[in-house]
Amino acid sequence: MFGAGGGTASYKEIEEVDVVLLWGSNAREAHPIFFHHLMKGLKNGAKMFAVDPRRTSSSKFADVWLGLDVGTDIAMANAVAREIIHAGLVNEAFIAHSTDGYEMYKASVESYTLEYAEKIT
């Protein structure tokens, strides 16, 4: 994940991923070196999804651009989290070992269905 000036993946890993999710990031302008490696990943077959109300220069390279309404990205994030939980894709061992308040978080996203997020975003 790349965001405010840093990331959790190496440039080499970005070149070898299957999917790239840019959420609120115009990496092409803000992180040009990272974007150079991202482009190698796209050339290697990665699919890119861009989530941003703006049609940025980065989003023009995306396979899918989700142009959410300004201020609705939290609803989208909560709906995605709810789907991950409902699909059983949560790493329960990691959560038990490394987090606090998960049950409260899980309850807080329960009302954010995909239908709700689609309607407001």
What residue spans do the PLM features occupy?
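Cofactor-pocket helix-loop regions in the catalytic cores of large enzyme subunits
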Residues: 1-121
